[in-house]
């Protein structure tokens, strides 16, 4: 008799355990990042677009002072599409928007100001342009803000900051 009761109890535990575990997993809140008002979340980062027009260096400094961020690094096509949508949804008419990509030693070796590896590339046709000698990179409106061109770092453009959420 005790053996039968043990078997029934064990059977019930085996049958109930998977469904109880599934309920527990479904009840867990999903990990979400919290971004300050005016910024938008993508992946584990917050993105802030401003139409304030600054030089590349001043824009990067602005981003560093804002939640320890940097000018935006675009590390994939998906992220580039998100950034382009963010800019377009603002309604801006700006032709160029700064990114964090630059050539600090002026030797045509590009680096993200955030220190991220420069692996993904989305240059506009004809860029980078060796005769232009631009050492900073902007997104261009004529490509829907999806392609990059090298530009004069002293030009004053709007920009996107990226920081951890």
From Swiss-Prot:
A single GO cellular-component term on record: dendrite membrane
C-type lectin domain boundaries: 33-163
Cell compartments where the protein resides: Secreted
Pyrrolidone carboxylic acid carried by residues: 22
Keyword match Signal: yes
Signal peptide: 1-21
GO BP, sorted A to Z: cellular response to chemokine; cellular response to gastrin; gene expression; liver regeneration; midgut development; negative regulation of cell population proliferation; pancreas regeneration; phosphatidylinositol 3-kinase/protein kinase B signal transduction
SUPFAM superfamilies on file: C-type lectin-like (SSF56436)
Tissue: Expressed only in regenerating islets and normal exocrine pancreas, but not in normal pancreatic islets. Expressed strongly in pancreas, moderately in gall bladder, and weakly in liver.
Principal location class: secreted
Disulphide bond pairs: 35-46, 63-161, 136-153
GO molecular function terms listed in the Swiss-Prot or TrEMBL record: carbohydrate binding; growth factor activity; identical protein binding; protein phosphatase binding
Keywords: Disulfide bond, Glycoprotein, Lectin, Pyrrolidone carboxylic acid, Secreted, Signal
Pfam families for this protein: Lectin_C
Domain of life: Eukaryota
Glycosylation sites: 129
PANTHER family in UniProt: MANNOSE, PHOSPHOLIPASE, LECTIN RECEPTOR RELATED (PTHR22803)
Function of the protein: Might act as an inhibitor of spontaneous calcium carbonate precipitation.
Protein name, entry field: Lithostathine-1
Recorded name of the encoding gene: Reg1
């Amino acid at each position: 008799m005790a053996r039968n009761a043990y078997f029934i109890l064990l059977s019930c535990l085996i049958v109930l355990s998977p469904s109880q575990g599934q309920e527990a997993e479904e009840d867990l809140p999903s990990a979400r990042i919290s971004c300050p008002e005016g910024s938008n979340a993508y992946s584990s980062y917050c993105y802030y677009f401003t139409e304030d027009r600054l030089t590349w260096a001043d824009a990067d400094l602005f981003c560093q002072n804002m939640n320890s961020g940097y000018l935006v690094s675009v590390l994939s096509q998906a992220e580039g599409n998100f950034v382009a949508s963010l800019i377009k949804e603002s309604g801006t008419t700006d032709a160029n928007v700064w990114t964090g990509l630059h050539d600090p030693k002026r030797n045509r070796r590009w680096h993200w100001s955030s220190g991220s590896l420069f692996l993904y590339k989305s240059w506009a046709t004809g860029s980078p342009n060796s005769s232009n000698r631009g050492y900073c990179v902007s997104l261009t409106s004529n490509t829907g803000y999806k392609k990059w061109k090298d530009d004069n770092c002293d030009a004053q453009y709007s920009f996107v900051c990226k920081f951890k959420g």
